[in-house]
């Protein structure tokens, strides 16, 4: 997303450091910045690891982090609390598809020394020291499940969805201290900071784990809306319920659960996916209306039984190249990904992929990176040609992929 560019954050941080002190401190800051390298974190949800890969080129693997070094301690605490145990098992047997969800989202700290991770089944956010693999701090979220996160443009704050508590909590990324929180709709999911850092957008997706998936039962899915808040006061600025906007253009049978979304570089348009739909929609922010709908091809081999689609997601994952001319869409249940021209909405080649669950952008902006959760690999697709570039094996059930910065000589924690 254009609003979440860690490679830009490091440049800003370095520039501020260089102007804050004398020659010695400036040189120190410059050396510190130069000692970091841009990478990608890949969260392997079902095995509790995060792979670190190159952010461009061959996307080769650099190292791996165990994001659940405290697993025994956490499991013991869950087993000692009947309510926590019930939720833990419910996550495993519903949204986890029979697996525990150990890592959802990840970001690096501004100094590149730590990885901050949200862990759904453990209902927390932890900071892990990249040098030692040990936990720096742990923040238990409200309720019983942690979900998507977002990092502020200056890299100092991280917002995490506490999905069973219907709220977002904002933390100091260095200390884990809670700075504020705000209420959302049912089951908050995606979070996006605007690029000026003034606002946070949260998308609540409702109860995606039930089998009442026919449009006639849509009302059972809960209160699904976008919440926009002031990123400094955490006060509500606006609520956007896509139900009204969908109905206005005749899409009464569409779900209003906004899934992955991405802004244009100027943030005038939002492109978003909704539950059960093979495609995406364009929303004009100023006009407050849906302006275009793009339906993407169905895979003939995909069952039309909605209850077989993972967590109500037919398509889940969307990103945009830095110039805002191309979109990349993960056609999750249809087993492909494709690059779409934003002006014409014409899709390119359908690149075969196994349950792609996320889409992001390479460090140089040339490629779309998708996580193939069904094949345990990430795949790069050239924005210019729409063709596959390379696939790289990772861990069990990769989902979120994020740009990050780590020490240049890092190859893994010393404890591994």
At which residue positions do the language-model features occur?
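Short amphipathic alpha-helical segments with coiled-coil-like heptad repeat character
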Residues: 1-4, 58-60
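Bacterial N-terminal signal peptides that target proteins for export
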Residues: 2-12
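Sec-dependent N-terminal signal peptides
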Residues: 13-17
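C-terminal segment of classical bacterial N-terminal signal peptides
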Residues: 18-26
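Predominantly soluble domains enriched in secretory-pathway, periplasmic, or organellar proteins
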Residues: 26-416
């Amino acid at each position: 997303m254009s609003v979440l560019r860690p490679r830009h954050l490091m440049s800003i941080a370095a520039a501020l450091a260089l102007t804050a002190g004398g020659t010695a401190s400036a040189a120190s800051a410059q050396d510190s910045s130069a000692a970091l390298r841009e990478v990608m974190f890949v969260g392997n949800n079902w095995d509790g690891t995060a792979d670190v890969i190159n952010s461009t080129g061959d996307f080769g693997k650099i190292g791996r982090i165990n994001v659940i070094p405290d697993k025994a301690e956490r499991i013991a605490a869950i087993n000692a609390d009947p309510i926590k145990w019930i939720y833990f098992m419910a996550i495993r047997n519903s949204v986890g598809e029979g697996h525990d969800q150990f890592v959802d989202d990840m970001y690096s700290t501004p100094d590149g020394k730590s990885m901050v991770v949200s862990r759904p089944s453990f209902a927390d956010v932890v900071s892990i020291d990249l040098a030692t693999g040990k936990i720096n701090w742990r923040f238990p979220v409200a309720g019983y499940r942690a979900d998507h996160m977002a990092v502020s443009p200056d890299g100092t704050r991280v917002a995490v969805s506490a999905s069973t508590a219907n709220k977002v909590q904002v933390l100091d990324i260095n200390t884990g201290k809670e700075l504020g929180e705000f209420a959302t709709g049912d089951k908050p999911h995606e979070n996006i900071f605007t690029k000026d850092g003034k606002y946070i957008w949260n998308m609540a997706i409702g109860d995606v784990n039930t089998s009442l998936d026919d449009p006639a039962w849509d009302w059972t899915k809960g209160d699904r809306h976008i919440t926009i808040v002031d990123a400094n006061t955490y006060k509500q600025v606006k609520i956007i319920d896509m139900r009204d906007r969908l109905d206005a253009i005749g899409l009464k049978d569409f779900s209003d659960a906004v899934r992955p979304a991405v802004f244009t570089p100027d943030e005038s348009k939002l492109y978003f996916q909704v539950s059960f739909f093979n495609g995406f929609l364009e929303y004009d922010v100023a006009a407050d209306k849906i302006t275009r709908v793009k339906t993407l091809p169905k895979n003939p081999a995909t069952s039309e039984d909605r209850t077989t689609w993972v967590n109500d997601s037919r398509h889940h994952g969307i990103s945009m190249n830095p110039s805002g001319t191309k979109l990349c869409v993960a056609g999750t249940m249809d087993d492909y990904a494709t690059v779409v021209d934003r002006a014409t909405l014409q899709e390119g080649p359908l690149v075969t992929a196994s349950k792609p669950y996320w889409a992001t952008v390479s460090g140089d902006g040339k490629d779309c990176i998708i996580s193939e959760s069904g094949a345990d690999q990430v795949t790069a697709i050239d924005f210019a040609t729409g063709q596959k570039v390379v696939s790289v094996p990772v861990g069990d059930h990769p989902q979120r992929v994020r740009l990050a910065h780590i020490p240049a000589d890092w190859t893994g924690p010393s404890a591994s």
